[in-house]
Amino acid sequence: MTELSRELRIINEKGLHARASARFVETVERFDARATVEKDGERVAGDSIMGLLMLVAPRGSTIRITTSGPDAEPLMQALTDLVGDYFGEGR
């Protein structure tokens, strides 16, 4: 089984808030893979909006994403693109 980890900086103005978390979960659910997100030693499932909100990840914070499963690589790329695109919210 493939497992990948990557650190990403949250760059959108409002951080990992409700709408951004929902987009993150929607992205995870499109793939045959699992994702976990870690910040400051706290780890949550990438398919849990509430879990993502509990991380309290404002702009400028760093999260570690780990993906595993058959689609681990395309999921990691999709999540990297999502974060890099400001969760589709502009800057």
Model-assigned labels for residue ranges:
Residues 58-91:
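C-terminal structural segments of small proteins and small subunits
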Residues 13-15, 77:
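Alpha-helical interaction segments
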Residues 16-18, 22-26, 31-70:
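Amphipathic, hydrophobic secondary-structure cores in small proteins
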Residues 2-12:
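Short amphipathic
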